[in-house]
Amino acid sequence: WVNPTPFSQSYYAWSCAAVKAADDLKYVFPGRWSIGHDYDVPLEPWPVDRNGRDLSWYRNNATPGSKSYFTVGERADFYGGWYETSDAGFGHWSRYEDMPGRKVWIWDLSRSGEIWVDLLTDRDGQYTEPQAGRLLNQSDHGDFAPGSADRWREQWFPYRGIGPMVQASPHAVLNAAREGASLRLGLFALRPVAEDLVVSAAGTELHRERVVLRAEQIWKKDIDLAGAAPDAPLEVRLGDKLVHATAPGSDDLERPLRFSAPTGGSAEALYLQGRGLERERRLSEALDKYLAAIAAEPLHVRALARAAELRTRAGEPARALDLAGRALAVSMYDPEANYVYGVAARRLGRLVDAKETLGWAARSPQFKGVALVQSAEIAILEKDYERAAESAYAALTGDNHNVNALEVLAVACRLLGRKREHHRVLGWLSDQDPLDHLARFERYLLGRKPRDREACRALVRGELPHETWIEMAAFYHRLGL
């Protein structure tokens, strides 16, 4: 995922699926608490609510209104569901730090929810939505840093024949149920597996055997726990492919989970309110908050820098320069203020000032990549192609996924006549972003071959293809080409 602009953008990413709603559906959603949309309810116990209802069963949600449950309070890489009658289920896996958000959406079980069966879904009855997100709640928006690229991995999967999952990985789904002096295990392979399965109690190995499975193969076994204390914590380990611990609360979070928006009229509160509005793309309201924060505290460097960026985005670089300059008068080496000053100065044609302040910004890990790309673009404007290539390579040392740096580097290599290097950079760019149209257009510009031109044109298939061409034209215009 790429933010190709020189400005901070709203960060909002959720992956949503639809599955069949049924009375025997059990949601396997790790968590101790749930919250609703817009934090319309405080933290509520999950899965059993304050009235003793186990809300993880679809049938127990027959109370007025549609339901959104965002489950929090437990660190887990997986979640999903299980149908009791068919002993089949579904799941989602990603590293928790990549996608900590877990949500289930349930339409009202009354007639007001049933209308959506005909309006939204297929002909197989009502549906419900498991969803995975980069943040904990869909009311939250993050920051997508200027010029940055982000990537993560997630996997949706089916499973069957083992009962409800208690753990999952990209390799297998596990069910584990302790029944007296034995542990009933079930594995469903998501891909070929050949690993030692080890069961331990309180750190002592009780059972080990080789498990070899093909994709979708089921393995079941009852493991004798003789010698283990009834309350001993158990661990099931499938090589380095899956680990499950039964110790109660082993993955519970103790950190505070307070979901609230800042209030009050202090400079810091106004600044934080502005940040929230900016993340929601309510830019004019955000600017008003930043200006109010500056009025309350004229030396608030972060508010000055954010207001300067929004002035630049609004096409007012001169006013932006004044605000960023005031921030630099307070903190000369502030990375954000230097970066915003450099972007605004470039738009005003003050390239010496732009290069100087972007150079200071590039010393900060936060702005290194994007500031160096801006410097590389200025170097191309000034026909200093060697310096442009050096700046682009420097940007890539900190982030070799930097698509903007690769695009500028490709242009610099072409203008320097370095055909082999140009070809290598285009391959690098295509590996990072196979849908990057500029890579194919650059290949055409180097050789001017009709087949390369047609290859580029043939893959511009978006709903608004003219916008793709306009964006590419704007890129070359920024470089003075």
Can you say where each PLM-predicted feature lies in the sequence?
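Long, contiguous interaction/recruitment modules in multidomain scaffold/adaptor proteins
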Residues: 165-265, 437-439
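A contiguous, surface-exposed recognition patch within enzymatic or periplasmic domains that forms
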Residues: 4-149, 157
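Alpha-helical repeat scaffolds
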Residues: 320-327, 354-360, 386-394, 419-431, ...
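Structural marker of alpha-solenoid helical repeat scaffolds
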Residues: 296, 330, 363-365, 398, ...
